[in-house]
Amino acid sequence: MLTGVLQDWVWEAGETANESCPVGSLRTASAVNSCHQGRIPLFTVGVESTKQVQEAVRFARKHNLRLVIRNTGHDLAGRSSAPDSFQIHTHHLQEIQFHADMRLDGSNTSLGPAVTVGAGVMMGNLYAQAARHGYMVLGGDCPTVGVVGGFLQGGGISDFLSLNQGFGVDNVLEYEVVTADGELVVANALQNQDLFWALRGGGGGTFGVVTRATMRVFPDVPVVISEILLEAPQAISSSWTQGLSIVLTALQSLNRDNVGGQLVIAVLPKLAVQASIKFFFLDATEATVIDRRMKPFLTKLSRANVKYTYSSKNLPHFSSNYRQVPDIHSDNDYGVLGSTVAISQQLFDSPQGPEKVATALANLPVSAGDLIFTSNLGGRVISNGELAETSMHPAWRSASQLINYVHTVEPSIEGRAKARERLTNTQMPMLYALDPNLKLSYRNVGDPNEKDFQQIYWGPNYGRLSNIKKKWDTDDLFFSKLGVGSERWDSEEQLCLLHA
């Protein structure tokens, strides 16, 4: 196992030198000679037990080592790696235990069915195990992402289940955490409540090493999935924009009936574009019934002379929809940058909302290989705001959709620098301008150059998070880029304390 390798090469190299050597690039002597350490940790410990996590944390503290926590290396800001660092890799913590009736220690209150998950478990494995027990789990659509890492500490947005079940952090019942002094503590609604609140949205690798977490599970219900596929030779055209507007209007309408959906736009060679929007009708069993429900939207596409393909299928279990095989990337060097912007329910549900979003997406400057996709919020995300005590920005409880933009980066230091500059100075301002009253981004997939991260990610909750950070990690043993308390340090390359 290559313990230091990240999901993509962008965050393996340093900020100022092209030091990375993706495996596929080692074809010439000159390429090999250019290899350096970059941001890959100097040392990694592959922990196999909670006790080993405690020993590793105490070792890092004793020797004043720069400590990073790695689950699967998917973080799009490179937080699971750092220059000159000592890494704790949680991959081997593979516990999965289901509870028919979860109760916290010292309480007789039933919290319903739940699952306890070790810090190394990936989504695909958990989905498969849950299905065998008749459950589905709120998670992401990438099967190789870790459940307990950044996903379940940074928010936990599910592209198509958050509408019905809320955020991942809304459904966490308990964390087991190794703190900066190497002690093992439990954080839940009954004990260490401040730490529990901070971990539910405050970001991974910041307050301690989460070794396992317990979260709610839900019945594995049947589903009908309908899909509309659009294609166009170029994005900037009236027919393309109109087609996007119509399918987003369908999303707007169906969301009101708690039907989740996801739009995915792929930029093809020569800037041709393809869009797929899928709708998930939970507890439905008859595809023909759903086809009749979708017919008015298809009629609108036909009348607008928008070419489309429609299909539908019924699955006896929603879990069957989850991909349970690893993502397959091309043999070329794989590197991406990405960011996100939230869209309020007030904007998206307005009569002009779908058209405004469609126009913004159609006019966003993109390159071949880029992806734009939505994550469905609203619904339970909003209603949970009255119930769930989480540290996420309160404005999430007014959000309807999340726009995700992923850009394929040229495999060079120049390509990386150009992509980051374009993302920060051109694309993100255009996306933020779509809903200027809600300047909100998802910390797990945020602009790596974000200057106002405290406000963008946490807003009025940041002060409390900062105080909890100081209480549980007085010496900032756990440093996370653009994380709580990181403003006290300079660039991650040097990591020198600016102020206490």
Curated annotation (Swiss-Prot):
Keywords: Alkaloid metabolism, FAD, Flavoprotein, Oxidoreductase
Enzyme class: oxidoreductase
InterPro entries (alphabetical): BBE, FAD-bd_PCMH, FAD-bd_PCMH-like_sf, FAD-bd_PCMH_sub2, FAD-linked_Oxidoreductase, Oxid_FAD_bind_N
Name of the protein: FAD-linked oxidoreductase easE
Cofactor(s) listed: FAD
Molecular function GO labels: FAD binding; oxidoreductase activity
Family: Belongs to the oxygen-dependent FAD-linked oxidoreductase family.
Keyword Flavoprotein applies: yes
Function statement: FAD-linked oxidoreductase; part of the gene cluster that mediates the biosynthesis of fungal ergot alkaloid. DmaW catalyzes the first step of ergot alkaloid biosynthesis by condensing dimethylallyl diphosphate (DMAP) and tryptophan to form 4-dimethylallyl-L-tryptophan. The second step is catalyzed by the methyltransferase easF that methylates 4-dimethylallyl-L-tryptophan in the presence of S-adenosyl-L-methionine, resulting in the formation of 4-dimethylallyl-L-abrine.
GO biological process: indole alkaloid biosynthetic process
Residues in the signal sequence: none
SUPFAM superfamilies the record matches: FAD-binding/transporter-associated domain-like (SSF56176)
Organism: Arthroderma benhamiae (strain ATCC MYA-4681 / CBS 112371) (Trichophyton mentagrophytes)
Pathway annotation: Alkaloid biosynthesis; ergot alkaloid biosynthesis
Domain FAD-binding PCMH-type: 37-220
EC number of this enzyme: 1.-.-.-
Encoding gene (name): easE
